[in-house]
């Protein structure tokens, strides 16, 4: 079972994403901030990270850089309510960019595709 780490400072979104991804057969872990997410990556490496950009403390862009510095083989999906970040070249290092929505279809499909692609490359 593939393990997905969800890093988002909004509890209701963490729960929504966790519920939908588990429904699709993924194991999930959740982190309320980037620091906690990075700890999980060190101690219990996930197969994929769903990462919010705007969070208190360390933002998702800095966390993305730290994830890539540690292990650039873990796919990262940037997930944000602000589509303007898509133009920020710092976000281009992510494997995918999804704009937050109450409809999780795009996020779930993106996770599936990236994990499938990652399995083929491994």
Predicted regions and their residues:
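Short amphipathic alpha-helix used as the core "switch/output" element in two-component signaling
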Residues: 39, 61-72
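As written
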Residues: 60, 90-98
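Charged docking surfaces used in two-component/phosphorelay signaling
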Residues: 15-23
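C-terminal output helix
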Residues: 102-115, 119
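Active-site residues of response regulator receiver
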Residues: 52
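Receiver (REC) domain active-site loop signature in two-component systems and cognate sites
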Residues: 55
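Hydrophobic/aromatic residues positioned on beta-strands within the core alpha/beta folds
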Residues: 77-79
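Helix N-cap/capping motif at the beta->alpha junctions
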Residues: 30-39, 60
């Amino acid at each position: 079972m593939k393990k997905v780490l969800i890093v988002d400072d909004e509890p209701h979104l963490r729960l929504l994403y966790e519920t939908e991804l588990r429904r699709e057969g993924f194991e999930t872990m959740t982190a309320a901030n980037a620091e906690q997410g990075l700890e999980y990556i060190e101690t219990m490496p996930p197969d994929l990270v769903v990462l919010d950009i705007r969070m208190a403390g360390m933002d998702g862009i800095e966390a993305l850089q730290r994830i890539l510095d540690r292990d650039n083989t873990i796919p990262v999906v940037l997930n944000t309510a602000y589509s303007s970040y898509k133009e920020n070249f710092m976000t281009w290092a992510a494997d995918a960019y999804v704009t937050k929505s109450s409809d999780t279809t795009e996020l779930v499909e993106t996770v599936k595709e990236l994990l499938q692609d990652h399995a083929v490359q491994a």
